[in-house]
């Protein structure tokens, strides 16, 4: 040993890594024995010092990082901004989730990096610091949880919980944080229990696969290699690790000079020389390149990990490899127990500005993009230098390539502001998985979208659409009401309605009494009980309210006065309004007796002589069965076509028998319907008295003649009351059979000259005994007064023209002549229905063909009435209606319920609204025509942008209208902004009238009607427009039904701003985002769609935007109604999972078992198939299969090795590549004989080794078709040469039975077979003597010649075809295909 004086004294802290280096150098220099002696001394020293120091940990040693407060605050601020963006529709839910996770993760990481410097500066001798950072006990993440911030936890599935734990364990957790933290802790406990066994099983399977691989030769003579080059973006450390301990496969030249020879062992010196010389790709030998089938040679394996020399012959390298991979798993599962499920994932690092100042960079080097969080940013491709100029200092910040720059040029930044985001490099491992995320609608309404949407090809007929580009989906608010209870709804587009009269909530139809008759809505819920007044109430002015004392009918016909009343009267005349009521007391009946049912066609259009309403008069109601007859002369029953009502689904009435008659007769009879099996106690045609027993439990109510008729399954038993006459033979009464005889007519027989006072019905009855008799029955007579013309009830219009609406009262019989009427038990039959028929005189040119109806609600004091309003229209001009699917031109059919009708009541006919429950109906497009959907827009769904006073407006025709700001007290109302529901805030549709106050002269002048109706309708002269769902715009003027394009109408608002005039263009149907600037009065408060554009204001229907990115799937159709909680969009995105080893081990296992769960392995399999097809096609059969399989296998081998290494490296576990290579070689060494060509040797579907397939093909000179296949480790263990090894692994009985049937032979080459049978194990480094030296070295020249011949042929073929598949095979394709690795190398492919 050298003298003590000569020794160098190192004053330096030695931590774990330094210790490793020291030991390895000691071994290199002094050998094993000496090193162990020195290490003993080091150990003793360590224990001695530890005892003397006796480090203890107190709670005061845990120092919290001072910068934590503002970091957390900063993160919370960012989350808040993010929430706002999401609300505005700038960021969708996935981006939001992703970003909030990254915000918190970055904060947590930043704190973790601050930890060490903080301790070093404030308290370097802190025991926590000493222990954790020396590597003695505890790691950074545990200390980080104690003094930094606990951060994001992952639940037992490895999914992230997106609520971060902001406290650390020193400060203590809040209740929520504690519960979330328990999630993570539970994960730790579960992992310790379950995953340990998993790791053990993994080790067992791995060893099973490779137990027979032993080093048997020195050199297999392969000329293949795998290229490794540091240029491929591989980290230098990994490059060195890959090379050290390998053997070169080829000479390496630097220019003309050879710097390393083939089969030379690579040590650290050689690696350094390569790096200095920047040698081009270095070809090395790996277990992949070894040519021996079931073992491996020394040169391909390389250095033995135990002692730094080439591996010895007879070493069981397979078992060593299996254990090296499996063992870290067992160790690592235990480690997660301490950190307890804290989420670790790779995220982008942030670059923060060093000081305040103005930022500058070269804009040519960046280009704009959208980050994965939905932020606008700049992407830089090369290193970017950013300068931040303060007054006196200039800071330079270097931003690495592929980073996002989050600031603009010349922007002022504050100190510590995030200016850039560095993309996470390849070194940090992110487990990604594809996740579908459904976004559910949080409000109800209809769906619109702002771009074209493609149908997904597999769902051509469904409602799943794919988005081609980023766009917004809008949910336009409104309460949907699906009218599936009744076949159609009385309400039409743009009708006013009380939301409570037709209950909006799904499921509860509390105030909607529905029968199978579709017209019986209790829509008209006016309570007139306090308002019954007799006589005609006359008021000053032409307006009249007429009441006839019963409270059933109230007609209002308001006339209109205006200075140009002539024009207006023409436009607004010809409508009248009927209020309806029902009696509250009798609400339990389905239909109030005196109530009127209204009958409106589905499309709201009346033809002439249509029936408008009907009511059932109680006088014409019978409770017994019978027959109706119409008068003596039956020719009277004239059926008029237009008087019929077409009922759909009405079971009660048979409308085809409806006729207008003057009087009719009802012949009562008693009817019993008995089942066919019941025994009848009376005979047919017998006469019985009252209360006779007919059947077992049936008694007759009246006496008379019994008729029994047998129908298919039942017996009908009728009892006629009345007299029976047996006429003589000479009587000619036979002609009276089945007729009605008026009173006063006597019989022809003089003997019985009897006169009847009432009408009678004579019916001849012929019993079986040929003697007939006549039954004379009593008849109930009904007289029906002829129709009254109700047109007289309406005041004549001032400018009377002949096309006024008239109403006639007409009575209809509901049953046909002579038809039997069956009374169902305890219900009464309505014989006559009173109808109101709508009529109007034909105009001279006959143009008025139809009348339109709509509902209006008028509120008088506290009373609400529903009115129906009828409107005459000239027949429509032909339009061209453009729909998204068909463009049809021509008249719009009357019953076009599949497209919104063009109704003249498009303007909102609300008179005064209740605060909440008032709404306007919008009809929706629906695919099925039977069930029409409505949406009710109530006041809470619309808001109005107030009048822009004092501004000038130009519309497209350059007319400028100046609003007059009169000092009028009523104008001030209009300036308030508010929801649409409160009357003054509607875009001046209606205004509340106080006593005789005159508005601006552009509004109509109306007398106030002595407080009866405080509110009437005003029609303004100024036009406003409405938009329906298809984007068509209507003028609500019944005579000018012109349809404009939505783009024809843009209003520009010119703001008088301080410096410049900006002009906003607003078009109908445009969507406005929240806080978008429209007027100079400040931003718009709510997002929504412009519904009505007015000269000085807008009405906006509130809507909620949802952002959707390309590739997202939209559910539902355009314009479809969505309810709360319906699926709106589905995003597919990649999501990080937590990256601890417990997620890692299953990943390793999945890779080794080749389960195609993630996109990577699926891609691998697809790539495999693609290669196989292409190469076979290009080169032809035998070589094609060979090369195809080899290239495929080579590709997949490398990517498998990289994937497994990635998992372990991320955990800081170093496993040498060659261990993984040995296992991967076994997984990929088999090929599957395919069915393409039959060969004599192998049957299709058989698994054979690749080398065996090649050799057999060469020997037989016959093409064997096969393709590469990836087997999992379990399948590989069950597909070995030895059935004993397979049987001892799994499925013993099956394996042994098959082997016996096939007569398999086990050559006992592996370790396991010999262990099972108790023989000698054919491994061990002392085994050399048994290997025949002669076979190793004295290769016969013939063999060598054959080998070279094949290689030469191979090379020629490859060079000849290089141009053809240059795309598939790289340029430095070396001797054979294995070297196609050049382009992958050992970096992540």
From Swiss-Prot:
Keywords: Chloroplast, DNA-directed RNA polymerase, Metal-binding, Nucleotidyltransferase, Plastid, Transcription, Transferase, Zinc
GO CC terms of this entry: chloroplast; DNA-directed RNA polymerase complex; mitochondrion
Cofactor detail note: Binds 1 Zn(2+) ion per subunit.
GO molecular function, one term: DNA binding
Domain of life: Eukaryota
Cofactor(s) needed by this chain: Zn(2+)
Pfam families: RNA_pol_Rpb1_4, RNA_pol_Rpb1_5
One GO biological process term: DNA-templated transcription
Subcellular location per the Swiss-Prot or TrEMBL entry: Plastid, Chloroplast
Xref: InterPro entries: DNA-dir_RpoC2_beta_pp, RNA_pol_beta''_euk, RNA_pol_Rpb1_3_sf, RNA_pol_Rpb1_4, RNA_pol_Rpb1_5, Rpb1_funnel_sf
Biological function: DNA-dependent RNA polymerase catalyzes the transcription of DNA into RNA using the four ribonucleoside triphosphates as substrates.
Complex and partners: In plastids the minimal PEP RNA polymerase catalytic core is composed of four subunits: alpha, beta, beta', and beta''. When a (nuclear-encoded) sigma factor is associated with the core the holoenzyme is formed, which can initiate transcription.
HAMAP family per record: RNApol_bact_RpoC2
Family assignment from sequence similarity: Belongs to the RNA polymerase beta' chain family. RpoC2 subfamily.
Protein name: DNA-directed RNA polymerase subunit beta''
Organism listed in the record: Chloranthus spicatus (Chulantree)
């Amino acid at each position: 040993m050298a003298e003590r004086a000569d020794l160098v004294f190192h004053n330096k802290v030695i931590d774990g890594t330094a210790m490793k280096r020291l030991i390895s150098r000691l071994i290199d220099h002094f050998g094993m024995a000496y090193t162990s002696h020195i290490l003993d001394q080091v150990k003793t020293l360590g224990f001695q010092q530890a005892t003397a120091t006796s480090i203890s940990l107190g709670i005061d040693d845990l120092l919290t990082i001072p910068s934590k407060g503002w970091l957390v605050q900063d993160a919370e601020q960012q989350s808040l901004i993010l929430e706002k963006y999401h609300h505005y529709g700038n960021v969708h839910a996935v981006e939001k989730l992703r970003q909030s996770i990254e915000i918190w993760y970055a904060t947590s990481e930043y704190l973790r990096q601050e930890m060490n410097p903080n301790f070093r500066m404030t308290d370097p001798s802190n025991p926590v610091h000493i222990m954790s950072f020396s590597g003695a006990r505890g790691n950074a993440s545990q200390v980080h949880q104690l003094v930094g911030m606990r951060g994001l936890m992952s639940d037992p599935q490895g999914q992230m919980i997106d609520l971060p734990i902001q406290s650390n364990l020193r400060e203590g957790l809040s209740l929520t944080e504690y519960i979330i933290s328990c999630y993570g802790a539970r994960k730790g406990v579960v992992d310790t229990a379950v995953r340990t066994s998993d790791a053990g099983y993994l080790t067992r399977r791995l060893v099973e696969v490779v137990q027979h691989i032993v080093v048997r030769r020195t050199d297999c003579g392969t000329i293949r290699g795998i290229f490794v080059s540091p240029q491929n973006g591989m980290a230098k450390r990994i490059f060195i690790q890959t090379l050290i301990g390998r053997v070169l496969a080829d000479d390496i030249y630097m220019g003309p000079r050879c710097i390393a020879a083939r089969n030379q062992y690579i040590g650290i010196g050689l690696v350094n020389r390569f790096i200095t010389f920047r040698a081009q790709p270095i070809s090395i030998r790996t277990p992949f390149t070894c040519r021996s089938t079931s073992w491996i040679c020394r040169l391909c394996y390389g250095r033995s990990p135990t002692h730094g020399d080439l591996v010895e012959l007879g070493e069981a390298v397979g078992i060593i490899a299996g254990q090296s991979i499996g063992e870290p798993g067992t160790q690592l599962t235990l480690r997660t127990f301490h950190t307890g499920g804290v989420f670790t994932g790779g995220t982008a690092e942030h670059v923060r500005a060093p000081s305040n100042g103005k930022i500058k960079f070269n804009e040519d080097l960046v280009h704009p993009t959208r980050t994965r969080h939905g932020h606008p940013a700049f992407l830089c491709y090369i290193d970017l230098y950013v300068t931040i100029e303060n007054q006196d200092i200039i800071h330079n910040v270097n931003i690495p390539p592929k980073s996002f720059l989050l600031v603009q040029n010349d922007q002022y930044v504050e100190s510590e502001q995030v200016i850039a985001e560095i993309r996470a490099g390849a070194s940090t491992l992110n487990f990604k998985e594809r996740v579908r995320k459904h976004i559910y609608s949080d409000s109800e309404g209809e769906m619109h979208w702002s771009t074209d949407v493609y149908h997904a090809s597999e769902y051509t007929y469904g409602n799943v659409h794919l988005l081609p580009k980023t766009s917004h989906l809008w949910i336009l608010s409104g309460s949907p009401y699906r009218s599936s209870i009744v076949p159609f709804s009385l309400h039409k587009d743009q009708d006013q309605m009380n939301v409570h009269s037709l209950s909006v909530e799904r499921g509860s139809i509390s105030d909607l009494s529905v029968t199978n008759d579709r017209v019986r809505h209790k829509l008209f819920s006016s309570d007139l009980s306090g308002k019954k007044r007799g006589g005609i109430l006359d008021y000053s002015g032409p307006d009249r309210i007429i009441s006839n004392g019963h409270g059933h009918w109230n007609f209002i016909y308001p006339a209109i006065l205006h200075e140009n009343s002539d024009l207006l009267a023409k436009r607004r005349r010809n409508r009248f309004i009927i209020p309806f009521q029902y009696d509250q007391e009798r609400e339990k009946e389905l239909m109030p007796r005196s109530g009127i049912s209204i009958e409106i066609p589905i499309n709201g259009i009346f033809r002439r002589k249509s029936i408008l309403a009907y009511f059932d008069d109680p006088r014409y109601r019978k409770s017994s069965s019978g027959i109706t007859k119409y008068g003596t002369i039956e020719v009277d029953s004239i059926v008029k076509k237009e008087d019929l009502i077409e009922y759909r689904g009405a079971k009660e009435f048979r409308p085809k028998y409806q006729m207008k008659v003057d009087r009719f007769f009802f012949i009562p009879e008693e009817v019993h319907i008995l089942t066919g099996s019941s025994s009848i106690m009376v005979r047919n045609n017998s006469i019985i008295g009252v209360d006779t027993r007919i059947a077992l439990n049936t008694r007759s109510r009246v006496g008379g003649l019994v008729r029994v008729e047998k129908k298919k399954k039942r017996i009908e038993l009728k009892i006629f009351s009345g007299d029976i006459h047996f006429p003589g033979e000479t009587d000619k009464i036979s002609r009276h059979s089945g007729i009605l005889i008026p009173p006063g007519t006597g019989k022809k027989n003089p003997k019985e000259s009897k006169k009847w006072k009432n009408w009678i019905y004579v019916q001849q009855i012929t019993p079986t005994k040929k003697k007939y008799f006549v039954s004379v029955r009593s008849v109930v007579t009904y007289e029906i007064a002829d129709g009254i013309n109700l047109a007289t009830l309406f005041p004549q219009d001032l400018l009377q023209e002949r096309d006024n609406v008239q109403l006639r009262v007409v009575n209809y019989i509901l049953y046909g002549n002579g038809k039997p009427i069956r009374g169902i038990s305890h219900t009464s039959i309505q014989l006559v229905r009173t109808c109101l028929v709508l009529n109007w005189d034909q105009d001279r040119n006959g143009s008025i063909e139809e009348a339109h109806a709509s509902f209006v609600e008028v509120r008088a004091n506290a009373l609400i009435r529903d009115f129906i309003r009828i409107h005459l229209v000239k027949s429509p001009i032909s339009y061209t209606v453009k729909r998204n699917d068909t463009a049809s031109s021509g008249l719009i059919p009357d019953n076009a319920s599949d497209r919104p009708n063009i109704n003249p009541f498009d303007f909102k006919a609300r008179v005064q609204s209740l605060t909440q429950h008032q709404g306007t109906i919008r009809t929706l497009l629906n695919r099925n025509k039977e069930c029409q959907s409505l949406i009710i827009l109530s006041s809470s769904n619309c808001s109005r942008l107030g009048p822009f006073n004092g501004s000038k407006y130009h519309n497209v025709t350059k007319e400028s209208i100046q609003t007059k700001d009169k000092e009028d007290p009523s104008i001030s109302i209009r300036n308030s902004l508010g929801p649409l529901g409160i009357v003054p805030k509607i875009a001046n549709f209606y205004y509340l009238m106080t006593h005789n106050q005159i508005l601006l002269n552009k509004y109509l002048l109306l007398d106030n009607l002595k407080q009866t109706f405080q509110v009437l309708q005003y029609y303004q002269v100024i036009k406003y427009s409405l938009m329906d769902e298809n984007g068509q715009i209507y003028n609500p003027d019944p005579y000018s039904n012109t349809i404009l394009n939505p783009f024809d109408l843009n209003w520009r608002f010119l703001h008088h701003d301080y410096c410049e005039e900006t002009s906003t263009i607003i078009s109908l149907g445009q969507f406005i985002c929240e806080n978008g600037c429209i007027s100079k009065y400040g931003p718009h408060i709510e997002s929504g769609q412009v519904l009505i554009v007015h000269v000085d204001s807008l009405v906006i229907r509130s809507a909620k935007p949802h952002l959707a990115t390309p590739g997202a799937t939209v559910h539902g159709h355009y314009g479809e109604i969505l309810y709360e909680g319906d699926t709106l969009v589905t995003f597919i995105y990649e999501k990080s999972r937590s990256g601890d080893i417990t997620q890692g081990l299953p990943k390793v296992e999945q890779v080794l078992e080749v389960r195609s769960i993630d996109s990577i392995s699926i891609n691998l399999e697809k790539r495999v198939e693609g290669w196989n097809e292409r190469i076979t096609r290009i080169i032809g059969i035998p070589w094609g299969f060979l090369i195809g399989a080899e290239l495929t296998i080579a590709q997949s081998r490398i990517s498998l090795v990289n994937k497994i290494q990635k998992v372990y490296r991320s955990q800081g576990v170093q496993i040498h590549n060659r261990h993984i290579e040995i296992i991967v070689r076994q997984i990929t060494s088999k090929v599957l004989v395919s069915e393409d060509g039959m060969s004599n040797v192998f049957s299709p579907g058989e698994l054979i080794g690749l080398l065996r397939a090649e050799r057999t093909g060469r020997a037989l000179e016959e093409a064997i078709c096969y393709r590469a296949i990836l087997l999992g480790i379990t399948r590989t263990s069950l597909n070995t040469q030895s059935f004993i090894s397979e049987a001892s692994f799994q499925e013993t009985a099956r394996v042994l039975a098959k082997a016996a049937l096939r007569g398999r032979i086990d050559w006992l080459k592996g370790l396991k077979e010999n262990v099972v049978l108790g023989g000698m194990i054919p491994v061990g480094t002392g085994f050399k003597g048994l290997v025949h030296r002669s076979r190793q070295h004295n290769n016969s020249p013939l063999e060598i010649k054959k080998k070279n011949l094949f290689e030469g042929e191979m090379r020629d073929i490859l060079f000849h075809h290089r141009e053809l598949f240059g795309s598939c095979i790289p340029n430095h394709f070396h001797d054979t295909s294995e070297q196609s690795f050049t382009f992958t190398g050992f970096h992540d492919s």
